[in-house]
Design a protein with these regions (language model features):
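Conserved, short, structured surface segments that act as functional micro-motifs
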Residues: 165-168, 186-230
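Short proline/glycine-enriched turn/loop segments at secondary-structure junctions
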Residues: 15, 125, 201-205
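Short glycine/threonine/proline-enriched tight-turn/helix- or strand-capping micro-motif at secondary-structure
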Residues: 81-101, 114-147, 170, 210, ...
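Alpha-helical oligomerization segments with coiled-coil/rod-like character
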Residues: 1-70, 79
Length: 230
């Protein structure tokens, strides 16, 4: 009996180690892609600021206002470092934030949240904790992952044979993981509730169909549940 229990404990420990290793691998990839997307957004905003400054200068020159600079009446443009988002991104961010608590679930059909945001005890093991950077949502086989808001696909990547999708909503980013297929590609514009891929169903686990979903505000990890209309 003791040997049997020890084997069971060893099996659970191996399972937890594998789960933690895969989660760390996934989160490292997500963090890297988000950092790259933030840098791209910064460059877009800086370019927009440069274009606006050039347009203002041209307009002032045409109106003969260039001499106003010597009188100290010309407004100084904000430094480029102040621009982290383009005008379109700022508007989209405001709309997204205004829908906190009203966003649709990122999975189609009936569902249950099987793992919540934050630390939780590993089942069957004492003093062992795991840290969920998002939430796990179990649906029915054939369930689709769907965009929670209008946005643009920032990245689509594969890891361990499964697809993962990042969608940018201004400075918010929603992340959809554990997909068997993806129906969008990087750069695509998506609408609220648009299907973006099929959630993987594990044939070795009675067709268990689980979407791992994360929400970020740039690099900050957010608890998705208060944002969703459950």
């Amino acid at each position: 009996l003791i040997t049997s229990l020890q084997k069971k404990q060893k099996g659970l420990q191996n399972e937890v180690s594998k789960k933690r290793r895969e989660a760390n691998q996934l989160n490292a990839r997500i963090d890297k892609l988000i950092a790259e997307e933030i840098e791209r957004a910064r460059k877009r905003a800086a370019e927009e600021a440069r274009r606006e400054a050039a347009a203002r200068k041209k307009a002032e020159s045409k109106e003969g206002k260039s001499s106003s600079a010597s009188r100290g009446t010309t407004k100084k443009a904000a430094p480029l470092e102040a621009y982290s988002m383009s005008k379109a991104d700022r508007e989209l961010s405001g709309n997204f934030a205004g829908n906190r608590g009203k966003l649709p679930m990122p999975i189609s059909g009936p569902y249950i949240i099987t793992s919540h945001y934050g630390q939780y005890a590993a089942e069957g093991l004492r003093n062992v904790k795991l840290d969920n950077k998002g939430i796990d949502i179990q649906g029915k086989p054939g369930a689709q992952a769907r965009a929670i808001f209008d946005g643009k696909v920032a990245a689509v990547f594969q890891l361990n044979g499964l697809f993962n999708v990042l969608i940018r909503h201004g400075n918010y980013i929603s992340v959809y993981c554990n997909l068997s297929s993806a129906s969008v590609k990087s750069g695509d514009t998506v609408k609220t509730k648009q299907a973006i891929g099929q959630v993987f169903s594990d044939a070795t686990d009675n067709g268990r169909t689980v979407l791992h979903f994360q929400l970020r505000k740039e690099k900050e990890k957010l608890n998705p549940e208060p944002w969703l209309n459950r």
